[in-house]
Amino acid sequence: MVKDILAPGLRVVFCGINPGLSSANTGFPFAHPANRFWKVIHLAGFTDRQLKPEEAEKLLDFRCGVTKLVDRPTVQATEVKLHELRSGGRNLIEKIEDYQPAALAVLGKQAFEQGFSQRGIAWGKKKIAIGATMVWVLPNPSGLNRIKTEKLVEAYRELDQALIMRGL
């Protein structure tokens, strides 16, 4: 099982959809070699070097955390059922209320729409908040996502810059 990496007072919690099989087998988030999460958060400015999946706990040193909408591992996120995403959305709200990070970044538009019963959303900062926590939707860094790495970095950097502007 892939455990959450959470603590009070984080700048951001990145929320994936669910663990892939590589993550389920290793116990580390975003563990598949084709997943660009670790590269993207480094290039966007969240970490001072590119961490490896097995160093995930070090995210806390950078005031970042990770969680997921659904615990059940799958080969592809499309295998996750709607009821799992809706339940995951409710559970995620509780986690965010408990830990109160400055921002929540949900990684994937469809996951956000289904988990939070929203439709037709755009990338970036959302008008909704969970308490004082800003909610962002960023592209999923999965290797199955065709978006170019440069575009991922640009989207994630926008969040990093917004946090810096708030003194975080």
From Swiss-Prot:
Subcellular location, principal: cytoplasm
UniProt keyword terms in alphabetical order: Cytoplasm, DNA damage, DNA excision, DNA repair, DNA-binding, Hydrolase
GO function term, MF aspect, one: uracil DNA N-glycosylase activity
Top-level taxon in the UniProt lineage: Bacteria
Chemical reaction(s) catalysed: Specifically hydrolyzes mismatched double-stranded DNA and polynucleotides, releasing free uracil
EC number(s) on file: 3.2.2.28
Compartment(s) of residence: Cytoplasm
GO biological process, one term: base-excision repair, AP site formation
Signal sequence bounds: none
GO cellular component annotations of the record: cytoplasm
Annotated Gene3D superfamilies: Uracil-DNA glycosylase-like domain (3.40.470.10)
Family per record: Belongs to the uracil-DNA glycosylase (UDG) superfamily. TDG/mug family.
Functional note: Excises ethenocytosine and uracil, which can arise by alkylation or deamination of cytosine, respectively, from the corresponding mispairs with guanine in ds-DNA. It is capable of hydrolyzing the carbon-nitrogen bond between the sugar-phosphate backbone of the DNA and the mispaired base. The complementary strand guanine functions in substrate recognition. Required for DNA damage lesion repair in stationary-phase cells.
Subunit structure: Binds DNA as a monomer.
HAMAP family to which the protein is assigned, alphabetical: MUG (MF_01956)
UniProt name for this protein: G/U mismatch-specific DNA glycosylase
Native species: Salmonella gallinarum (strain 287/91 / NCTC 13346)
